[in-house]
Curated annotation (Swiss-Prot):
Catalyzes the reduction of the macrocycle of cobalt-precorrin-6A to cobalt-precorrin-6B. Disulfide bonds: none annotated. GO terms for biological process: cobalamin biosynthetic process. GO terms for molecular function: precorrin-6A reductase activity. It catalyses: Co-precorrin-6B + NAD(+) = Co-precorrin-6A + NADH + H(+). Its EC number is 1.3.1.106. It comes from the Archaea. This is Cobalt-precorrin-6A reductase. InterPro entries: Precorrin-6x_reduct. The keyword Oxidoreductase applies. It comes from Methanothermobacter thermautotrophicus (strain ATCC 29096 / DSM 1053 / JCM 10044 / NBRC 100330 / Delta H) (Methanobacterium thermoautotrophicum). The keyword Transferase does not apply. Keywords: Cobalamin biosynthesis, NAD, Oxidoreductase.
């Protein structure tokens, strides 16, 4: 397991089991002689949805929010949204379980991306093993008409390779982490990819052989007009994207491609068994549920 980095305000340090100051930020260890000054909630972040949830929770003075994210960029955004503590780095179920114990967490809110199936499975396992309450925010599915639905990015690359003509490229709008599978069936110079403007994302594209002129480093959600301009500029003959919902800008991508008559290859979400779990597609409903749980537990000092 990669050791995550924890950041509290301006102080940064590496997390090790039992090295976190138990009195820091109002966190107390479990025990009959100790009482939490604040109720600890973990939010698995890295999405716009998570940032909205963090912002809502951070406005409650009796709740302390710890956000986890796989990248420094994700942690920075979570901190700006109001998280009092951020944990940067991938956490497996053991890492999450130890973090829950160190924070004496009441609830874990999983607001990770719909395609972060492994993260969700890790969270479910850790919560079941510790008895921590698990709550999932799941973006409502959006499947536009006319798209080509596939089950994997490798399959998406295979389909795209059969659709583009001479001088055309595949516009990859599904992030750098999925690019390697797509390139199994396509030469790197036949792909243009839009990625976050981070050094790691750009370096990965270059390592995979994508020409620098085909790397579009931008952060958004983008309008249909912006997508349309990019598709025209790069002479896209097909688009690869994933079912990331409205928050992920899927409708705008499909609208732009449809205007140009370009086929859209849509990779469907991986399935995770959430039967019996509290799953919400609306943040207001999720917050109502979480607040009821916290009030039933009793605010600190009750």
């Amino acid at each position: 397991m990669q050791t995550p980095e924890i950041k509290e305000g301006t102080e940064q340090y590496l997390w090790r089991r039992k090295t976190m100051n138990p009195g820091d930020k109002g966190v107390k260890r479990k025990g009959s002689d100790r009482q939490r000054e604040k109720m600890s909630v973990i939010v698995m972040a890295g999405t716009e949805d998570a940032r909205r949830i963090i912002s809502r929770l951070s406005g409650m003075p009796w709740v302390e929010v710890t956000a986890t994210a796989t990248t420094e960029h994700g942690s920075d955004l979570a901190e700006k949204s109001g998280a009092s503590r951020t944990v940067t780095g991938a956490l497996d179920s053991d890492g999450l379980r130890e973090l829950m114990a160190d924070l004496d967490a009441c609830i874990l809110i999983d607001a990770t991306h719909p395609f972060a199936a492994q993260a969700t499975e890790n969270a479910l396992r850790a919560c079941r093993e510790t008895g921590t309450i698990y709550v999932r925010f799941e973006r409502p599915e959006v499947i536009p008409d006319g798209v080509i639905r596939v089950g994997s990015f490798r399959e998406a690359g295979e389909v795209a390779s059969s659709l583009i003509g001479d001088g055309e490229v595949v516009m990859h709008l599904a992030g750098v982490s999925t690019l390697g599978d797509v390139l199994r069936s396509l030469e790197p110079e036949r792909v243009a990819v839009r990625v976050l403007p981070s050094t790691s994302s750009i370096e990965k594209c270059l390592q995979l052989g994508v020409p620098p002129s085909h790397i579009i480093a931008m952060q958004g959600r983008f309008s249909a007009e912006m997508n349309l301009a990019l598709l025209r500029e790069y002479r896209a003959g097909a688009v690869i994207t994933k079912e990331s919902g409205e928050t992920g800008g899927l409708p705008e991508k499909v609208e732009a491609a449809s205007e140009l008559g370009i086929p859209v290859i849509l990779v469907e979400r991986p399935e995770v068994n959430l039967e019996g779990e509290a799953v919400f597609g609306n943040i207001n409903d999720l917050m109502d549920h979480v607040l009821k749980i916290l009030r039933d537990m009793g605010q600190p000092g009750d």
